[in-house]
C-alpha cells in the first residue's frame, strides 16, 4: 500500500464504541440465528462503531452489507475478516461507512455461521462471502478440499440473504445450481 495514502486514512480512524460479539442460541444451524444479541466483552472479536438502526415506522431496505474475507484457522494464516457497511448515507451521495468488524482465526464453517449471525443482527443484510479461498485447492491454505458448496448451501438453507453470482444464460438453460459467494 502507498504509505502516504495510509497516513491520510489513519487520521480518520477511531476506536470502536463497543467490543464484544453477537451470539445466538447455538454456533451453527438454525439455532445460530435465533435470539441474536450483542454482548460486550473486552476480549471479543467484533468491534462495533454503530449498532444497527432499525426503525418501526420506516424501513430502509438493503441498508447494511456484510462482507467476508476468508482467511485460515492457524496462527500463521491470514486473518478472516467480516465487515459490515452502512449504506444509508449513499442515498445523499456520500460513501458507505464501516459500522462493525470481526476478525480472527476460525474454522471456515464456523466463520460462515458467525458471518450469518452478524448479517442477520444487522437487519438481515446481504451476506457476501468471498469464495476464492473456499474453492481453492492450494494445500497451503488448509481448506481440506472444496467445502464451499456444502458450507454455503448449509448457510443458504437458513439465511436467505446470501449473495449468489450471476448465472450465464447457458447455466440457466441447464438449470445449473446457483453458485454462492463472491469469486
Label each region the model flagged.
Residues 1-171:
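RNase H-like, metal-dependent nuclease domains and their acidic two-metal-ion catalytic environment used
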Residues 172-176:
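Domain-level recognition of nuclease-like catalytic cores that cleave nucleotide substrates
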Residues 179-183:
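Conserved motor-coupling elements within RecA-like helicase/translocase cores
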